[in-house]
Each structure stands twice: as C-alpha cells, then as structure tokens.
Amino acid sequence: MFEEMILEKVRKEAERIAEEQGLEIFDVQYRRESRGWVLRIIIDNPVGYVSVRDCELFSREIERFLDREDLIEHSYTLEVSSPGLDRPLRGPKDYVRFTGKLAKIVTKDGKTFIGRIESFVDGTITISDEKRKYEINIDDVKRANLEVEF
C-alpha cells in the first residue's frame, strides 16, 4: 500500500482513538529512516501535558488497529510520543494555550524573538523579555516553539 494511503488510514484511526481518550493528534509520520521504516504518532493533551500513561494507552489501541488491518506489509517501528517540552507552536490556538510560557519566534525576515507569550489577539502575538514587549503578526512567523525552562 502506498505511504500516503497508509498515512491517511492511520491518521483517521489515530484521531478517533485520540478523541476517545481526550487527546489530539499533533502529527503522524510514516517514513524510511536509517534504522528502517518508522510510524511516528505524536499525541497532545489540549488541557495539559501528555503523560507516559497517555502514550501507553494510545499505543495499545493503535497497535490493535494496525494488527487487525495489517496495512503495513514490511517490518516497522511504532513510536508514540508527545510534542516535547520545546514543542512547535503551530497556530493561534497554541499561542492562546501557552500564554505565559517562554517561546522563541523566528520571523520570515530572519529576526529572532525570545520571551514570554503575553497574548494573541486579532492575529498579533505579543511577547516580552526583560527589556520590552514585541508585537508580531502571525503571518510573519516562519517558525516558533516553546523554550525549555529550568
């Protein structure tokens, strides 16, 4: 079966399982890597953080589906994980959800901003560092992620 078809079927079932478990699908990847084929499903918890238990329960359910449907003809590794502490920020919902958290934003013109997300209103992200506040239009963002705090 073609990779795109496998990915589509797995994503659909992953979204169903995630919804049942109060989770969301952050990403689904199926690709060949140096150690062989990898099916990577990244889950998210919209009201908190993903626990090891969340990954375990989700993994069991998706494994049942994969075994039953037998979509992948060759050997592969299944990985279920969270987006991580330094997770990418991928849209308005994330900027609202992570208000108060430390983030790094790189704009399309190459500028880098590191600061706390203060707000997201009408397409504008406001972040601040120790010195000042910055307002960044979401359309100008090339990439953004949370920064790990120690």
Swiss-Prot record:
Keywords: Cytoplasm, Ribosome biogenesis. One of its GO terms (biological process) is translation. The keyword Cytoplasm applies. One of its GO terms (cellular component) is cytosol. InterPro entries: Ribosome_maturation_RimP, RimP_C, RimP_C_sf, RimP_N, RimP_N_sf. It comes from the Bacteria. It is found in: Cytoplasm. CDD domains: YlxS_C (cd01734). Pfam families: DUF150_C (PF17384), RimP_N (PF02576). HAMAP family: RimP (MF_01077). Belongs to the RimP family. NCBIfam families: PRK14638.1. Required for maturation of 30S ribosomal subunits. This is Ribosome maturation factor RimP. It comes from Thermotoga petrophila (strain ATCC BAA-488 / DSM 13995 / JCM 10881 / RKU-1).
